[in-house]
Regions:
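Two-metal-ion RNase H-like nuclease active-site motif
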Residues: 1-13
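Short, flexible loop/turn motifs enriched in small residues
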Residues: 12-18, 83
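Short beta-strand scaffold segments in enzyme catalytic cores
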Residues: 19-23
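A short, polar/acidic, helix/strand-boundary loop motif
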Residues: 26-71, 96, 103-109
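Buried hydrophobic packing segments
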Residues: 72-77
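RNase H catalytic domain
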Residues: 78-141, 146
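C-terminal functional segments of enzyme domains
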Residues: 125-190
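Positively charged, lysine/arginine-rich intrinsically disordered segments
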Residues: 193-197
């Protein structure tokens, strides 16, 4: 699986904070034994403005891009539970965010809360993520984070909601986040089976 995430912080804009993801599902055979089926290549994307109540959870500072990049990285796994059990190459255009995600540590308490949620949720999803740097100009997720959908339209990408995990849950124990991941993945699996039967 290939994942790109991005964040935008433009304090002078009407919508100052935005997060986005793009996910590429390669064509592949899925299932086991005689139940195997071919699933065609597809793209999905999502973006959203970060609400004020979420921004108020961050420590006051002039620059929030680091926290927003981490929020985008967590949000894609929360929004796309089909990433469960997958090997993921995840591209981000912010080296500080990549370092924090790899180490699982930040000296900033608000960033540390996001990293805690990411680590626990990833364990619950059983997703194996490999983080790589991508220059901003080559990061396809930079486009939806700035309300540009032309290329994604050409790729036939389907829009999905970008779901920011509820902040009230961010301080929950790791076990709760793992259970949350399993529940979301199971719900998505049931919905996907329903969509296939309806075809």
């Amino acid at each position: 699986m290939r994942v790109w995430t991005d964040a935008a912080w433009e304090p002078d804009e009407a919508v100052p904070a935005c997060v986005a993801f793009v996910v590429h599902f390669p064509g592949e055979w899925r299932g086991e034994g005689g139940a195997r089926r071919w699933e065609a290549e597809r793209w999905v994307h999502g973006s959203c403005a970060v609400p004020d109540d979420v921004m108020r959870r961050f420590y006051a500072r002039e620059q929030y891009i680091g926290q927003l990049e981490l929020l985008a990285a967590v949000g894609v796994y929360y929004s796309v539970p089909e990433l469960r059990g997958r090997r993921v190459v995840h591209w981000i255009d912010n080296t500080s965010a990549i370092a924090a995600l790899i180490k699982g540590y930040s000296r900033s308490p608000d960033s540390a809360r996001i990293l805690h949620a990411f680590a626990a949720f990833s364990l619950g999803l059983e997703a194996s993520s490999w983080f790589e740097y991508v220059p901003s100009r080559a990061n396809i997720a930079d486009q939806p984070s700035r309300n540009d959908y032309e290329l994604l339209g050409e790729l036939g990408s389907a829009e999905m909601p970008f779901i920011i995990p509820p902040f009230a849950a961010w301080d929950e124990p790791a076990e709760a986040w793992m259970a949350r991941a399993v529940t979301r993945a199971a719900a998505e699996g049931a919905a996907a089976r329903g969509r296939k039967r309806a075809r």
